[in-house]
Amino acid sequence: GFGSLFKFL
């Protein structure tokens, strides 16, 4: 989900 993307950033 988007949460994972933010974590990656």
Curated annotation (Swiss-Prot):
Expressed by the venom gland. GO terms for cellular component: extracellular region. It comes from the Eukaryota. The keyword Protein biosynthesis does not apply. Keywords: Secreted, Toxin. One of its GO terms (molecular function) is toxin activity. It is found in: Secreted. Belongs to the cationic peptide 04 (cupiennin) family. 03 subfamily. This is Short cationic peptide-1g. It comes from Cupiennius salei (American wandering spider).
